[in-house]
Amino acid sequence: MAVATLISILFAVLALRLCYLLIHALFLSPLRHIPAPFMARVTSKRPLWHLLTGKAEIAARQDYSTFGDIYLCKPNTVYLCDPHDACTVLSSHAFRKTDMYRVFEYEGIPNVSTFTDPAQAQRRRRQLHPFFNNAYLTQMEPVMLKYGIQALKARWDAQLARHKKVEVNYRFDTQLAMFDITGALVFGREFHALETSNLVYTKWVNNTLSYMLVSHYFPWVKRVPLSWLVRGLKQSYDDLVAFSQESIAIRQADLQAGRPKPADLLQALLDAEDPDSKAPMTAREVQAESIAMLVGGSESTSSVISWVIHFLLLYPEHLQAVVAETRANFPADHTITFNESKANLPYLEACIYETLRCIPTASTSFPRVSDQAIILKGYYIPAGTEIATNKCAAHLHQPSWQDPDRFYPPRFLNQETYHETRRNMLSFAYGTRFCIGRNLAWAVMMVTLANLFKDYEVELPEDSRFGPTIVDAAGRPKIMPTKMGVATMPADPERDCRMVLSVRITE
């Protein structure tokens, strides 16, 4: 009887709680006038559910189609779909990052991306900025070339020495190459991932991100006995932490032994000084930044490269334009550098921009919050409301983009709209907290793709499930399915990310 009474009381409490949530959401909330899916008004777990089920991108597009330029995604979180509104928020220090960014912190130590205090964030950015400018990138470029396109060419050329044509998986190969680049730059060590087809480091990154997310949203799973549920994720996390600690110790020992300083990101972190006190970062701060760079940089860059290749294989007219551009500007035996690609390959750059527009690195941004009220699209948004950007919608927004569903790289070559189109791109964020690794990512993407299309003929395999003639209801080539991880990634890369390579045809 006592148990039945207790259960009845429990259900009554839950019913009262539900009634309160409904009444507050529909009649009392200061955001009740803003359009929203019903579940978004009563629970904050809707975006998390979409993320965990891989439906984040689909939901982002559907919500924009249904609710328009502004809507609620959680009871106290507004999503913006107009890139102009997003830029208003992202360009102001008045809108600070929320604690949600702490998901990506190592042991609670902030990194350049997770500081919520604008002053602290700017101080760290001033520490690191000299090492992400073009001059320092030029010093690091030999490492990018060695472990990137040169390693890829060595792998592919070895296969082409035995066969006239070879099928390669461009997702796996470029992914491994990006890990080798990041390992060399961030940890000063060789992963040999591409050479040995070693996916251990890929596992480290994806499992570490998953562990950070799970630990943030469900902290109780770290406690016994539930900790066994995440023991595999925790092991990858611990392995990455140990590797980073060891890498820092090795570098410090090399410096104490009088060996010359390499031009890489690990050395940049060790040399970075507080702009005011001139104090260096602590070993744990260096470790936090290095882990963040590996987790945030390698997978996102390699996934963009994969998407560019995918789109160009679907649109032969743009592929032919890129091939013609690279070969008209550079001889076959020349390795194209970043500065050369920036100066001579505008069409390739436009293709990368257009790919980032069609497939943003993430479907949404994490929220900002302001201590002051703001009016956007005629809606009053009170102080304390979280504001995030629906990147998928912002990159399809009308009238910001003409014919937004069309893959059309020349939109980024129009001089009249040159600055506007780039301002509307939110893949690397915008304003005061744009991605500090943006220039490095662009360097790796441009150099890898430029040399690929200069040196090889590429085509789809005969049994590809995607191609120029395999179209959707609108008559456009279907694109391969996506999934959300560190970035927007191909859902089935083993099946869908295959291309046939052959040696460049010379006239």
Swiss-Prot record:
GO terms for molecular function: heme binding; iron ion binding; monooxygenase activity; oxidoreductase activity, acting on paired donors, with incorporation or reduction of molecular oxygen. The lineage of its organism: Eukaryota, Fungi, Dikarya, Ascomycota, Pezizomycotina. Keywords: Glycoprotein, Iron, Metal-binding, Monooxygenase, Oxidoreductase, Signal. Glycans are attached at N111, N206, N339. Its cofactor is heme. Pfam families: p450 (PF00067). Induction: Expression is under the control of the secondary metabolism regulator laeA. This is Cytochrome P450 monooxygenase helB3. Heme binds at C435. Its EC number is 1.-.-.-. InterPro entries: Cyt_P450, Cyt_P450_E_grp-I, Cyt_P450_sf, Cytochrome_P450_monoxygenase. SUPFAM superfamilies: Cytochrome P450.
